[in-house]
Amino acid sequence: MATLTLGGSTAVGAAAVPTPKPDLNVVSVQPTGAQKVGVGHPVVVNYRTPVTDRAAAERSIRVVSPAAMTGSYDWVSPSTVHFVPDELWPAHSQIKLMVGGMPRSFETGASVVAVADVSAYTFTVSIDGVVARQMPASMGKAKFPTPIGRFTVLGKENPVVMDSRTIGIPLDDPEGYKLTVNYAVRITWGGVYVHSAPWSVGSQGYANVSHGCINLSPDNAAWYYNNVGLGDPVVVQA
């Protein structure tokens, strides 16, 4: 029979493991166990008060399964951090975490990955590694380029009102607009969407004419809207 010393106390018998003390400053963790999300969804940790020791908070966020998943931390506010995996989560899997000393988990669905190719004027969607649809698209014009990088679906709106004043363009400016837009899939909080744009169908596949959004035909936008969910990745490449 083994004797194990833990924190100054002595336990006799099987090896004892100290129960982790939960971080009471953690208010919520997303995704929750009840959610099935896309393979690019970040882990979002909200704290009750602003975090002064960010390094300690980051150390308390650990991926248990799958093993060897690494990522980066993005503090979007003094009390909210996003853990963004370097690689996409495995599809159709349970992801297990430790956050603030407490176990958490969520599930991923299919791997629905969209690639917007700015120079090829295409928007290609693969589901579980198989190309499901390649669509002609129009991205941001030179003055309003679509940002390059990997993004995730933040929400869906059908319809949504898009107003150029929210990005600093007055309505009476030649570039001004206020439009009701269908099948809008948000990929940045700054206002970049993938959406239906019947007015630019003639340019889709040939030229980039938008104010930064990814324009699709109504039919293609509806298909994407109906096949995409929160956390699905959108990769914009030059």
Regions found by a protein language model. Give the residues of each.
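Exported/periplasmic cell-wall-interacting domains
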Residues: 110-113, 141-148, 164-238
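Low-complexity, Pro/Ser/Thr- and charge-rich linker/hinge segments at domain boundaries
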Residues: 17-19, 107-130, 145-148
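Conserved hydrophobic/aromatic pocket- or pore-lining residues that grip, position, or stack substrates
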Residues: 123, 153, 185
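Short, solvent-exposed loop/turn elements at domain surfaces
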Residues: 54-56, 123-125, 146, 160-164, ...
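Solvent-exposed coil/turn segments that connect beta secondary-structure elements
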Residues: 48-50, 66, 76-78, 86-88, ...
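Acidic, low-complexity Ser/Thr/Gly/Pro-rich repeat segments typical of extracellular/periplasmic
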Residues: 1-8, 12-112
